Amino acid sequence: MKSVTVAGIDCGTNSIRLKVSRVSEDGVEDIGPRILRVIRLGQDVDKTHRFADEALARAYEAAREFAGVLAEHPVDGIRFVATSATRDAENREEFEDNIEKILGVRPEVIPGTEEADLSFLGATSIVHREVEAPYLVVDLGGGSTELVLGGDGVTHPSTQVQAAFSMNIGSVRMTERHLKNDPPTEGQIAEAVADIDAHIDEAFKTVPAGKTHTIIGVSGTVTTMTALAMGLTEYDHTAVDG
């Protein structure tokens, strides 16, 4: 297998990230820095169903930074995926057009089901083989959350998805919808919890979570909480991942 250098850009509701890797028979090797920028693209999208001008400006600024990195690390291909906020935004074509002008690649707006599958594949690819399946992958994003159950305990990384569900609850969406004060009131917290519980009850009609042996958390929300629990003063993905 000839080695190829590829770039992946993941544009979510709260953050956008870039990873450049060389893929060969020997595996995957990171090339250059991993970059994450908090752009809050989903600002007010839950309420207005449109991208705000200032949110688009932040996204374009990050895209221009990524273009500079890619100029230093030429790639054979780029995949740019956009998720929850872009799915919901009525003016997403403007976003897609401008990103294509900056990066030369058009954002691919993927459905929640594909987001769930990709989250599962990515998460299980770094799980140690001795971690027992089935796995429940929880991808808690800014605009949506995906629950994915799967894994046969043999295939690695696992592609054996048994059930998946994507729901419109996430850290940005719930904050804007319910948590109007800082700190939020007890009533606002109760409203958020009730909203989340209702969505989870619906998800569990599709995803038989009772079969889970290992829960795997994915996303900035999960890694931030993990870093806090570990007492990290600076975020270190090598300490948190896996």
Residue ranges and their predicted role:
Residues 2-30:
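N-terminal basic/disordered segments at the start of proteins
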